[in-house]
Amino acid sequence: MPELPEVETTRRGIDAVITGKTLRRLLVRESRMRWPIPADLPGLLSGRAVLECARRGKYLLLRFEHGTQIVHLGMSGSLRSVPAGEAPRKHDHVDWIFDHATLRLHDPRRFGAVLWHPDTAGPIAAHPLLARLGIEPFDPRFDGAWLHSQFRNRAIAVKQALLAGDAVVGVGNIYASESLFRAGIDPRTPARRISRARCARLADMVRATLADALASGGSTLRDYVGASGQPGSYFEIHAAVYERAGLPCRVCGTPIRRLVQGQRATYYCPSCQKR
């Protein structure tokens, strides 16, 4: 699933392409996504200008004068800029057509979402998908004290607490495993047992890991590409544990282990990461 670095890389790539530009047509080839795309959405947006291209967690927010379009890339989606008139490929489900270019949503598994939140429904932050999201990892308030305050009453494993999204947003499966490795914390450790000092280390490593991923254009394991169609290179350059089960740890040489937590694969070094 595209995580914060992939979504932010996409946002940066499409921002200059669409912000301030008028959407000529929203073309929906397949409306059966995670939630059905409203049938009246093309009519609501055609001829309207995009005022802002923002992000909250893993959601892209396209701001119009009368509301906000919420776009989620799902498990396998990507949003890229293509030349006007370029023929669609299989699984190209939605086009945002501008005078000079087209944004195209490609989503083989159709777990993504294209939703509409009118201004008359209240602030976008109150939308049910956004209202309970945690703090952004690059927010100055995100530090060890914050993380400790969010973890201290949670009995679940620290990896699952990171994935929950209500303490900090945008840290998905890849970067949770990588951040915990860099922080030296066993992913099975109950969140409430993580000391304030270790929370400080973990907060630093979450930020550092995500910053490395942003600088690399995210990670491409299967389907993700950035707005220009380029794959991300974080996995090839930086990944220390993710999908490296049985291979030697880059620090100590101990074989990396794989386990399943909450139906998600977790990778860790049993020597470098302590409970």
Curated annotation (Swiss-Prot):
SMART domains: Fapy_DNA_glyco (SM00898), H2TH (SM01232). It catalyses: Hydrolysis of DNA containing ring-opened 7-methylguanine residues, releasing 2,6-diamino-4-hydroxy-5-(N-methyl)formamidopyrimidine; 2'-deoxyribonucleotide-(2'-deoxyribose 5'-phosphate)-2'-deoxyribonucleotide-DNA = a 3'-end 2'-deoxyribonucleotide-(2,3-dehydro-2,3-deoxyribose 5'-phosphate)-DNA + a 5'-end 5'-phospho-2'-deoxyribonucleoside-DNA + H(+). A zinc finger (FPG-type) spans 240-274. DNA binds at residues 91, 109, 154. Involved in base excision repair of DNA damaged by oxidation or by mutagenic agents. Acts as a DNA glycosylase that recognizes and removes damaged bases. Has a preference for oxidized purines, such as 7,8-dihydro-8-oxoguanine (8-oxoG). Has AP (apurinic/apyrimidinic) lyase activity and introduces nicks in the DNA strand. Cleaves the DNA backbone by beta-delta elimination to generate a single-strand break at the site of the removed base with both 3'- and 5'-phosphates. PANTHER family: FORMAMIDOPYRIMIDINE-DNA GLYCOSYLASE. This is Formamidopyrimidine-DNA glycosylase. It comes from Bordetella petrii (strain ATCC BAA-461 / DSM 12804 / CCUG 43448).
